[in-house]
Amino acid sequence: YHLHTIRTSLLKEILNHFEFSQKEINKHVLKLINNGDVIFTHCHSTNVVNSLIYSKKKGKKFKVYNTETRPLFQGRKTAVELMKNGIDVTMFVDSAAAFAIKKDDKSDKIYVDKIFLGADALLKKGVINKIGSGMFAEIASRNKIPVYIIADSWKFTKDKIKIEQRSLNEVWDKSPKNIKIKNPAFEFIKRKYISGIITELGLMKYKEFLRKIK
């Protein structure tokens, strides 16, 4: 009975933290979004999606570009959740991300104002997130578009992270035996591509976040 009480109390504490964290993240994202912004996101991050929905409910007017996120199409979940909350969403195939993010050569117009990415792990040297995230951050950096990581500070770890290789069947079911298929689930986003990080601790530079989290 005593162990059950401890477990219940611990679970409540964890849930309270995540609820508090999301509320704080929402406030900082709301301040960051300007009316008329086009925000690009990738995969499905609960922190990102919830904060965008919150900003919409608070009256901010913005559009979202997102990726389908192959091979499991998590981007569809993001698009549907945003659409159901009245947010204007345009979904791109993953390989068209550079087309969505880059400057227009004729008008020099940048299609995207900000990039919001979630995080599977926050590390000292950068962030681990869904495969494709590092590439999108690099494209954004070349076009001088700010990249913001939106995540709970509890995702910080000093452990070494091994990139998970997932089943080839996710990519090509019943593929010919002599064709090798690589299906990495995540990749690294270098710190130099990250303009800022939003956690329950606030919006700050990644260096500052590392100082606070110690």
Residue ranges and their predicted role:
Residues 1-91:
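N-terminal active-site beta-alpha-beta segment that forms phosphate/nucleotide-binding
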Residues 67-214:
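Conserved phosphate- and dinucleotide-binding cores of soluble alpha/beta proteins
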